[in-house]
Amino acid sequence: LSKIAGYTSGQYNVDGGVMEIIAYNTATDWAYAVNGQTGMLTAISMENLTANGSLELTGTEIDVKGLVENQDATFSYGDMTSVAVSPDGTLLAAALQSEGYNDSGRAAIFGCSSDGSLTLRGIVETGIQPDMVVFADNGTILTADEGEPREGYGNGAADPRGSVTIINAEELTGTVVGFDGFDSEEKRAALVSSGIILKKNTAPSVDLEPEYIAVSDGKAYVTLQEANAIAVLNLADQAFEGIYSAGFEDYSVSPVDIDKKDDAYAPKTYGSLRGIRMPRRGRSTERLISRQPMKGMDANGATRILEPFI
């Protein structure tokens, strides 16, 4: 690999969140980078790049925070966590979390122009803490609403419900799909017995925290990292049809390097060590690849999900 171009924001933040997530519009040759600290999207042109040089790119900032707060007086911006472009390049969606960690988020939906500019088409309310946004197709947008207990579990703290929001991009409507269907004593026990990690005395609808989504054949595969699981969402039915354990790693068989006292990589096996795989990120593709992120693919008529584990 050789670098042919780059963009420098000129900004720095000890907490991160500057130029964190990037989406590329193949139809217009523009990239959009998320700056969650400022609520800005930076539009960067990728036209006229050559393999012979190292071009310093320029960017144009788009004030997503200001646009959304001006149009939706009930929303107080907290963070912009994700951005995605529709397959045909006509739409862009940005996921925004509320300032209040127990309040619903928003998905801002824009029309894309060939000059890189964006036109706000509408704002859709999502579940709590949308952490990732993805287009299932040109007309359907999904957000993974993580619902983390950001102030712990003490008195007065809230543990928000995790969910996935299904958005109709044309009608600008959203349906928040949660995990209430797994809250019965019988179904919760079945999840635990299958290897899914749940907090004691907590309902799955409260404890599960969607983080990332891969889409294939009308279904969304949703990583639940802390629960060591992947949930399957039927998009037509708008309901979760199953939650499946990612299993456990046997490090008496699989070598691992857990010694961080030096910079060397020296994996070895441990006779009595087991690990939780904790699936994290995902993206849909028809090709077989491995290692970060999760992938959805078709093989001999069956859908396969490939998930790298931390």
Where is each model-derived feature located?
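Mobile, glycine-rich extracellular loop/lid and propeptide segments
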Residues: L1-S254, Y270-G296, N300-I310
